[in-house]
Structure formats: structure tokens, C-alpha cells
């Protein structure tokens, strides 16, 4: 891992940060330039959450496939 590179966020961490961004933007007292930056951060966090949910959905489908036989296969998390 590169020095400045942060480890990937968990779903819960991304949701918490996204909720904070939304709350700040909803207050409406953020300068325009900062609001645009926050909006972009929120969109990125939303993408992280969506990707993690999609990965979990694929794992659940894999577990429940083939006539209800419970067969778990761990899938690699999709990377950009």
C-alpha cells in the first residue's frame, strides 16, 4: 500500500460519512465551492456503498443457488 493511500472503507464507514455529507449539505450554509466538493465526495461514497451491496448480493445468490442447496463461495470484492 502506498503511504498516502488509505485502506478501503467498510460499508458502515462509507454510510456514516455519506450521512454526514448529506446532513451538512441539507443545512444549506456551505459555500458553493465546498458544496460541490462535498457533493462529489458523497457521490463517491454512494458508489462505494453500491459496490459493496452488489458484492454481498452476488455472495447471497451464490449461497442460495442450485435448488436451495446452501453452497457458499466467497467472491473477490470488485476493484476499480
From Swiss-Prot:
Is Nuclease given among the entry's keywords?
yes
Q: Which keywords, in A-to-Z order, does the entry hold?
A: Cytoplasm, Exonuclease, Hydrolase, Nuclease
Quote a single Gene Ontology cellular component term. Answer: exodeoxyribonuclease VII complex
Which residues constitute the signal peptide according to the record? Answer: none
Q: Which Pfam families match?
A: Exonuc_VII_S
Name the catalysed reactions: Exonucleolytic cleavage in either 5'- to 3'- or 3'- to 5'-direction to yield nucleoside 5'-phosphates
The record's Gene Ontology biological-process terms are:
DNA catabolic process
> What EC designation does it have?
3.1.11.6
Tell me the superkingdom of the source: Bacteria
- Give the UniProt subcellular location, in the record's own words: Cytoplasm
List where the protein spans the membrane: none
What are this entry's molecular-function GO terms?
Answer: exodeoxyribonuclease VII activity
Claim: Hydrolase is one of the keywords in the record: yes
Physiological role: Bidirectionally degrades single-stranded DNA into large acid-insoluble oligonucleotides, which are then degraded further into small acid-soluble oligonucleotides.
Q: Which family does it belong to?
A: Belongs to the XseB family.
Its subunit composition reads:
Heterooligomer composed of large and small subunits.
Protein's name in the database: Exodeoxyribonuclease 7 small subunit
Gene label: xseB
